[in-house]
């Protein structure tokens, strides 16, 4: 009996999707340049159904790719050949909210923004706010360790969860908590991209809404002056709720798309949000304004509506750029903040070298870059040129002491770059961790951690007499 027949026989027929046309919507995630149709898609609405899918796939040695809302930007939820996609988007219960403890227990398919909506009546909200928060799920956020424009002060997903439940490949439920002694397994699972287990329940930390929030918008005549302002704000002990930069191209695209009132003609834009008590915000605002002497324009939000509108422009940057070009490639690297100006200048030089336009938006407070490379996949060779450009940006991040990913994950997009960032001994550890949780390598295989052979082919791993190191390790 085929695996599709087994799934259809063991589960409600309305949650099993098969057939080439029916599975097409699941052939990629937000990184649509890479596509692969799965054997089948299962959309369980009960945890018992998740367990049954794992059981059937394990017995048939069939790979499982877990999917949330499909908003990821690294190909982490892209199916692999002959795989089953396990979509968790129907597991949408907000199980409980504890306003005293400031926590909420939710299923993995709950949307990021829906948590804040559910907690609003208690004066609480969920702080991490990726640009896709209206659609992305908390399970996907945990899998990628998502951040957002407010991560500088309030942290990434890993800083805002108390515990998670996962189901391993054997169907066994495991619980990882911030209170656990010993190894930080909660942190290990956060950002594991579906390689180690299926996230089935999350206890998130809720944050009290600030008394006051003000957003300062400053335009600059040079990117370097804007980057220097970022450094000055941090050096003066200010911890903004959000600290974002955009270059001229991103400013123009966002203004055309969302009409937030950005200063057209500026070479760079700084958005600095200050929140807390009225006294704290007033004092911090005075300090920040004194540090913006080189800004060509400065505006401070006067209402909540204005603050949200100014943020809307930044959060609309990706779709705004998407309207300008047939395709765009969104990068995600991190660098030390002191290198912001230099790195942006080098990215612009690479843009000229490859004859591809770039819009730069990034979380300036923690050095998380999001260059958007514009290209046309219909032009022969342009995708390959774009990928090469993207890899050069990631190498640049590594060269200045940064990382190849800040919040989008590795997925399939950055597998080659992993070979540049990590040594063979470090990849050895990654493979051993994967094998400890998933001995058959059925959970999202081929993602996040490159095979040793792949790195050897790239010339970043020594091969002695034709033999790869660590022959005892799995090759996937």
Model-derived segments and spans:
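N-terminal flexible segment immediately upstream of the FAD-binding catalytic core
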Residues: 1-55, 72-102, 131, 206, ...
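Alpha-helix capping/hinge segments and adjacent helical runs
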Residues: 12-13, 398-410, 435, 439-446
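C-terminal substrate-recognition/cap domain of FAD-linked oxidoreductases
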Residues: 17-27, 204, 208, 214-222, ...
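FAD-binding subdomain of flavoenzyme oxidoreductases
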Residues: 93-246, 443, 460-476
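Intrinsic disorder at enzyme termini
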Residues: 423-476
């Amino acid at each position: 009996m085929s695996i599709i027949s087994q799934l259809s026989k063991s589960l409600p027929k309305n949650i099993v999707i098969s057939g080439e046309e029916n599975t097409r919507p699941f052939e990629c995630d937000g990184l649509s340049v890479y596509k692969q149709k799965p054997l089948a898609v299962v959309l369980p609405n009960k945890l018992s159904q998740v367990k049954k899918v794992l059981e059937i796939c394990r017995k048939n040695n069939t790979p499982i790719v877990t999917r949330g809302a499909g908003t990821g930007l690294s190909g982490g939820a892209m199916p692999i050949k002959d795989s089953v996609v396990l979509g968790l988007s129907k597991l949408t219960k907000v199980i409980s909210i504890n306003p005293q403890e400031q926590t909420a227990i939710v299923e993995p398919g709950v949307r990021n923004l829906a948590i804040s909506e559910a907690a609003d009546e208690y004066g609480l909200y969920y702080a991490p706010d990726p640009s896709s928060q209206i659609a992305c799920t908390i399970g996907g956020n945990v899998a990628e360790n998502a951040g957002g424009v407010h991560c500088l002060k309030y942290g990434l997903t890993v800083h805002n969860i108390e515990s998670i439940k996962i189901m391993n490949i054997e169907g066994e439920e495991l619980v990882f908590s911030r209170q656990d002694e010993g190894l930080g397994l909660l942190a290990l699972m956060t950002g594991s991209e579906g390689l180690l287990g299926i996230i089935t329940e999350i206890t998130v930390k809720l944050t009290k809404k600030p008394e006051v929030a003000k957003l300062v918008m400053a335009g600059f005549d040079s990117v370097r002056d804007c980057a220097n302002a970022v450094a000055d704000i941090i050096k003066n002990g200010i911890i903004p709720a959000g600290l974002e930069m955009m270059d001229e191209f991103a400013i123009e695209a966002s203004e055309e798309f969302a009409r937030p009132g950005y200063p057209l003609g500026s070479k760079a834009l700084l958005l600095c949000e200050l929140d807390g008590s009225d006294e704290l915000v007033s004092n911090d605002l005075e300090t920040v304004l004194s540090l913006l002497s080189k800004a060509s324009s400065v505006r401070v939000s006067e209402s909540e509506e204005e603050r949200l509108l100014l943020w809307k422009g930044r959060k609309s940057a990706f779709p705004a750029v998407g309207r300008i070009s047939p395709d765009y490639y969104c990068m995600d690297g991190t660098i030390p903040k002191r290198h912001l100006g230099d790195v942006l200048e080098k990215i612009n030089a690479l843009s000229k070298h490859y004859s591809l336009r770039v819009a730069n938006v990034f979380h300036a407070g923690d050095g998380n870059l999001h260059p958007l490379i514009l290209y046309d996949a219909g032009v022969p060779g342009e995708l390959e040129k774009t990928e090469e450009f993207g890899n050069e940006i990631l190498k640049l991040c590594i060269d200045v002491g940064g990382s190849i990913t800040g919040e989008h994950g590795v997925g399939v997009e950055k597998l080659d770059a992993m070979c540049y960032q990590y040594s063979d001994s470090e990849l050895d550890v990654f493979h051993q961790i994967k094998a400890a949780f998933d001995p058959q390598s059925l959970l999202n295989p081929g993602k996040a951690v490159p095979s040793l052979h792949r790195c050897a082919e790239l010339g970043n791993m020594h091969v002695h007499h034709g033999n790869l190191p660590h022959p005892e390790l799995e090759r996937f």
